[in-house]
Amino acid sequence: MPVTRKLRTSLLSASALAGAAALVLQTALPAQAAVDFDVTATVETAPVSHSGDAADDPAIWVHPDDPAKSVVVGTDKKGALEVYDLKGARLQRIDGDHGNNVDVRGDVVVSADDEAAGGDGALHVYRIDPATRRLKHLKDVPTEVTAHGVCLYRSPQSGKLYAYPNSTSGRVEQWELAVSGDSVTATSVRLFDAGSAVEGCYADESNGKLYLGEEDVGVWVYGAEPGAGTARTKLDSTGSGGHLTADTEGIAAAGNRLFVSSQGSNDFTVYDRRSGAYLGRFGVASGAAADDCEDTDGIDATATGLGSAFPKGVFICQDGSNGAPGSSGNQNFKFVPLERITDRV
């Protein structure tokens, strides 16, 4: 069972108990590092269609003509891909997509579905129409790895679009996706082993780096280009000496900040996007408009202004325990004005 923010608060009250009882509580659960600060969300989405552990990963699509009309694509891994406006209202639901992770580059949306192709996994490729803000399915790409997580990358060197499906076995694949109109040609260009289970990933066009979250270990940094091989460095670790708590989940960037979600401690670490230096840790607490983000899987962020609601950008987190205030019930996604974070770290 994840150590939620509410549970963590109740555990802290145990310090008033006798020393022996408090010691039992302290040794029964992993130590949780304190956050540097909390922020609150101003918007939350409608709950996903399925109950239980269903919502997982958000991806932001910025409208090319009117950023206030941007949308968020969210996965419901029990059987739907959903599209929300910036007020959190559902605009579209695509049934039958068991995507666990999703990412966007330009007008191309790709989800990683580990139940597709008879359980072997596939990438579902869509195009988003700016006029309707709806997704159109283009192609399913069976993958060699059982696609669990995915991120996209538009190479500054070649202009080519790449997808990186990855799996709970630790295998990572790189696919070139040539999208022309409604036609998609997919070519596998790299395959490597990152170790144990991976899921969260982020490919950064600003520095050519591919960030991979090995859930129980930490975040690795590879080269994003297809010829980069398997050389890697470690951004940060779980456990002693690191700032992350397993499971290492979502990874996203906005402006000069890189964010990583630690599912086991219900918080988010922040790094300098250029140097990789650790900057701090924050949580998303309950506020007037929405409850907190707990047991978070995926995250996304952008520093692009999205109209009056998010003039300096937005940070989005999946909430594994959706309660009051606001909508409650099935899991959903919370929207935090980005400056509430970047003004403090």
Where are these regions (language model features)?
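Secretory targeting and sorting signals
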Residues: 1-33
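Sequence/structural signature of beta-propeller domains
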Residues: 2-9, 32-345
